[in-house]
A protein has these predicted regions:
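Bacterial N-terminal signal peptides
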Residues: 8-18
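Internal helical hairpin/lid segments
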Residues: 214-268
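Short Gly/Thr/Asp-enriched flexible loops that form oxyanion-binding sites at enzyme active sites
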Residues: 107-125, 141, 269
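ATP/nucleoside-binding phosphotransfer catalytic cores, i.e., glycine-rich phosphate-binding loops
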Residues: 258-318
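ATP/NTP phosphate-donor binding region
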Residues: 23-98
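Conserved anion/nucleotide-ligand pocket segment
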Residues: 149-211
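Short internal beta-strands
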Residues: 71-73, 132, 251-258, 284-286
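Short, acidic/small-residue loops that bind anionic groups at enzyme active sites
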Residues: 120-142, 150-157, 282
Length: 318
């Protein structure tokens, strides 16, 4: 199986240098963002077609930051590859000994079809770190449910294009093992600190995982939820379904991230308070994660603690 290698990526990226500059010359420096042990980033695609100019811009920046990219052949194709081909390319890249980290080219839609067919026994043989987002909520939570790899949710490459300096610094801290505290708003408090491991992502995809029975066991976990305006009208339906299925029954806490941001703030606040009243665990809001420039990486294998006043602290170290 052949991939687009480092040299081809550099050449292709230089063709789009003008696009990168026009899009904003003062983009955050990405040097060291993925930690000292990441030299080669594998870039797979299991969902929608990639916006090429945006992809080449971020590729250019990553190469300038010192990373080597291995890009799956379907990333720059103009049509979505077959499910079987997307599956095979992902599995091959996962098992490639040169690849230190997988960061998907984009989210979009279509990941569910690939996730359903993955050879999990094969993937268990390599503890690959994977960063997925949005539609890839389907993959990273399925990894957690299957006990495969090291799942994280955070910006895919086309999302990283518009991540701001604060976001990049926060992601760099996480990937280097020194994430800083984040102060959250308390929607429904607790008498003592809550602690656990994270799970979560885009509400629509968490809802789909629930319906399919693929959602990881949330017992003792802290569930992070974002919701884009595209799905705002279905918020009650999706949360209601997850409530009915008992998703939140034994969770340690729920953290609301970017949520219906273009809806009236008072209406969103009321909706979250109504939701919090229906579940037994504490609920917090205001974590910077979602389809926003000021986003974060959430590491599903890193323990975190939330104090009664809403201070979220991650465990330190690699």
């Amino acid at each position: 199986m052949k991939f687009v290698g480092h040299l081809m990526c550099v050449v292709a990226a230089t063709q789009f240098a003008a696009v990168a500059i026009a899009a904003g010359a003062k983009r955050p420096d990405l040097t060291g963002m993925y930690g000292p042990d990441v030299k080669t980033i594998g870039v797979p695609l299991i969902s929608s077609v990639v916006p090429k100019a945006k992809f080449m811009e971020i590729s250019n920046r990553l190469v300038k930051a010192g990373y080597r990219l291995k890009v799956a052949p379907n990333v720059l194709e103009s049509k979505v590859a077959s499910v079987e081909r997307r599956k095979q390319l992902l599995e091959d890249m996962w098992m490639d000994p040169e690849v230190d980290l997988l960061v998907f080219a984009r989210g979009g839609q279509g990941a569910v079809d690939v996730v359903e067919k993955l050879d999990w026994e094969k993937l268990k043989k390599r503890n690959m770190r994977v960063i997925g987002f949005s539609d890839l909520t389907m993959l990273v939570n399925s990894m957690l449910a299957k006990g495969v790899g090291h799942p994280m949710t955070g910006p895919v490459l086309t999302t990283l294009c518009y991540s701001n300096k604060a976001a990049v610094n926060r992601m760099r801290d996480m990937m280097n093992g020194c994430p800083k505290d984040v102060k959250l708003c308390v929607v429904k408090g607790a008498d003592k600190p809550v602690e656990g491991l994270a799970m979560g992502g885009l509400l629509d995809r968490l809802h789909r995982l629930t319906l399919k029975g693929w959602l990881p066991d949330a017992t003792g976990r802290i569930i992070f939820i974002e919701n884009t305006n595209k799905y705002a009208s279905r918020t009650d339906e999706m949360l209601g379904c997850m409530l009915e299925k008992g998703v939140f029954k034994k969770a340690a806490a729920v953290v609301i991230c970017d949520f219906n941001s273009k809806q009236p703030k008072e209406a969103t606040r009321k909706k979250l308070e109504e939701f919090a009243a229906k579940i037994p665990c504490p609920v917090f809001s205001g974590f910077p994660y979602g389809h926003i420039p000021n986003t974060s990486i959430i590491d599903f294998r890193r323990k975190l603690t939330i104090s009664p006043d809403g201070t979220l602290s991650w465990a330190q170290g690699k």
